[in-house]
Curated annotation (Swiss-Prot):
Residues 132-194 are annotated as: Disordered. Belongs to the Antp homeobox family. This is Homeotic protein ultrabithorax. It comes from Drosophila pseudoobscura pseudoobscura. Residues 132-146 have a biased composition (Low complexity). Its main location: nucleus. GO terms for cellular component: nucleus. InterPro entries: Antp_homeobox (IPR050296), HD (IPR001356), HD_metazoa (IPR020479), Homeobox_CS (IPR017970), Homeodomain-like_sf (IPR009057). Sequence-specific transcription factor which is part of a developmental regulatory system that provides cells with specific positional identities on the anterior-posterior axis. Binds the consensus region 5'-TTAAT[GT][GA]-3'. This homeotic protein controls development of the cells in the posterior thoracic and first abdominal segments. It activates the synthesis of the decapentaplegic (DPP) growth factor. The gene is Ubx. It comes from the Eukaryota.
């Protein structure tokens, strides 16, 4: 495919080879109207650089009847002379730039809202028409002022920003300029994207008087705009996190602790514990973190677990997996249940032992008391004799 474009009769033709590099490196200076029109026609859409691998090679320009017709049309529209196509992004005026009317930076009463579709449809107010041809680089909206409209691309690199809407105000984005807030819809697909005329609907919403902003007023993003973009992205990332009620309570505790800077560590702990005991609900811990709730078992699950525990106090891995599938529980839940059940059994056995010992002690005390009473009775009989 590259070899086809590198041939003498490539798709874009050699006027792009000869003059496209001059536009990318040396700017728009010292070019004839025909060379500028050919380079503007041949510049690939949505590309800020030449797609050719050997773009540094200079080749002879071959004129064709098609180039001649394009040159004549450009001379008729933009006027003759080398200064007709010169543009400078750094010297943008309020109303006109180098003889071209800046419709993107006007907030007057006669500026209609421009279409946001492919080539941009004609808007309300005094905006006349929106043209969208197949090979046109972008739609041209001629205002009623009589002055030719400035082309949309300020530099080859800015066209990429125009289609990607990186500058926030490209012709493709929602920009207007009419005082009455006119809404316009213009036909036409994306301009210059295909060889055939595009079909689509573009909708432009007019902004209030003086509120329209120039989409190409700044070729580079300023430091304030970059900082605002970074702040907006960080805010968007922070909004993705889920907020729970306990976060507000925990944040209140931390803010109260930081408010009193003289509180020592121990005093801060006691203060947080007192707040936790008074403000936090039962299912929240002292540090504001959620405690895991108790697992409730159904009667069927408890019965099956008790039967298995009666058979064997310790489960193998295989048996634990089988019971987990049978009772719709996890292995961890069954493991913890058996641990708790063994601890409960141990406590029960210990309690039984203590009861047995207490009974033995009580029986021993009773036997001792009975023996003492019998001895006392026997001693009394001996004294009487």
């Amino acid at each position: 495919m590259n070899s086809y474009f590198e041939q003498a009769s490539g798709f874009y033709g050699h006027p792009h080879q000869a003059t496209g590099m001059a536009m990318g490196s040396g700017g728009h200076h010292d070019q004839t109207a025909s060379a500028a029109a050919a380079a503007y026609r041949g510049f690939p859409l949505s590309l800020g650089m030449s797609p050719y691998a050997n773009h540094h090679l200079q080749r002879t320009t071959q004129d064709s009847p098609y180039d001649a017709s394009i040159t004549a049309a450009c001379n008729k529209i933009y006027g003759d002379g080398a200064s007709a196509y010169k543009q400078d992004c750094l010297n943008i005026k309020a109303d006109a730039v180098n003889g071209y009317k800046d419709i993107w930076n006007t907030g007057g009463s006669n500026g209609g809202g421009t279409g946001g579709g492919g080539g941009g449809g004609g808007a309300g107010g005094n905006a006349s028409n929106g043209s969208n041809a197949g090979n046109a680089a972008n739609g041209q909206n001629n205002a009623a002022g009589g002055m030719p409209v400035r082309p949309s691309a300020c530099t080859p690199d800015s066209r990429v920003g125009g289609y990607l809407d990186t500058s926030g105000g490209s012709p493709v984005s929602h920009r207007g300029g009419s005082a009455g807030g006119n809404v316009s819809a213009g036909g036409g697909g994306q301009s210059g994207q295909s060889g055939a005329p595009g079909v689509g609907v573009g909708v432009g919403v007019g902004v209030g008087a003086g509120a329209g902003t120039a989409w190409n007023a700044n070729c580079t993003i300023s430091g304030a705009a970059a900082a605002q973009t970074a702040a907006a992205s960080s805010l968007h990332q922070a909004s993705n996190h889920t907020f729970y009620p306990w976060m507000a309570i925990a944040g209140k505790i931390r803010s109260d602790l930081t408010q009193y800077g003289g509180i020592s560590t121990d005093m801060g702990k006691r203060y947080s514990e007192s707040l936790a005991g008074s403000l936090l609900p039962d299912w929240l811990g002292t540090n504001g973190l959620r405690r895991r709730g108790r697992q409730t078992y159904t009667r069927y699950q408890t019965l099956e677990l008790e039967k298995e525990f009666h058979t064997n106090h310790y489960l193998t891995r295989r048996r634990r997996i089988e019971m987990a599938h049978a009772l719709c529980l996890t292995e961890r839940q069954i493991k913890i249940w058996f641990q708790n059940r063994r601890m409960k059994l141990k406590k029960e056995i210990q309690a039984i032992k203590e009861l047995n010992e207490q009974e033995k002690q009580a029986q021993a005390q009773k036997a001792a008391a009975a023996a003492a009473a019998a001895a006392a009775v026997q001693g009394g009989h001996l004294d009487q004799n």
